[in-house]
Regions:
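N-terminal segments that mediate ammonia production and transfer
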Residues: 1-210
Length: 210
């Protein structure tokens, strides 16, 4: 992690030009991003996750089906400052999305379909959309099956595609909101028996302000 008072975008551009062998995972002031290959428990120990403190966390374990098993291809992906996205599913038109966005100055780093979605949202946020508007535009642009979970410095958001093929469950209490693909990932949480549980509806955007 590099900490500097300089403009984050300027630092990222400098690294890309003068040290292209260095991968920039994320830039910003609020969100730290970690990616690696291995068992979740080993990665958590390697980076000292138990010592981290914050208001919200987005995590993802990935079974690669169409792209390489490398940290660069792992989730979360980022779009601009303090934004992260994880994805359960598969997009059928990532190459068309890429073909549309590259002439607009959007840079891609992998062939991962999740990055195509992330770069689409990056473009829309750059054009002035708020996150909900960007996601709504994605309904007509991103083709495939997906559940997207996104985090910013101020917001947590989940959305599923029109068919809602990929599972998701939300638990809400007075103290926390927890989201997972399956309930068994939430079953150990405190007071989970008192939580309001629901599955997000197709193409309905759910968000929580931090």
């Amino acid at each position: 992690m590099l900490t500097s008072a300089a403009d984050p975008d300027g630092i990222a551009a400098w690294i890309g030009h003068d040290a292209p062998e260095v991968a920039v995972l994320s830039v910003g002031q609020s969100i730290d991003l970690y990616k690696d290959v291995g068992a979740p428990a080993d990665i958590a120990e390697r980076y000292g996750f138990k010592h981290l403190r914050g208001s919200h966390l987005v995590g993802h374990t990935r079974m690669a089906t169409e792209s390489a098993v490398t940290p660069a291809h792992a989730h979360p992906f980022t779009a601009g400052r303090d934004f992260c996205l994880v994805h359960n599913g598969s997009l059928s038109n990532p190459h068309l999305v890429r073909k549309k966005l590259e002439p607009l100055g959007i840079t891609f780093e992998t062939d991962n379909d999740t990055e195509a979605a992330c770069r689409f949202f990056e473009w829309r946020l750059r054009e002035g959309d708020d996150l909900k508007t960007a996601v709504t535009r994605g309904f007509s642009e991103l083709d495939g099956f997906y559940t997207f979970l996104m985090g910013t410095d101020r917001e947590l958001l989940i959305v599923r595609d029109a068919f809602a093929c990929k599972p998701a469950v939300v638990a809400e209490t007075d103290d926390y909101v927890a989201i997972a693909s399956e309930f068994r990932s939430l079953a150990h949480l405190p007071d989970i028996s008192q939580a309001a549980l629901f599955e997000p509806k197709p193409e309905e955007i759910y968000s929580w302000r931090i």
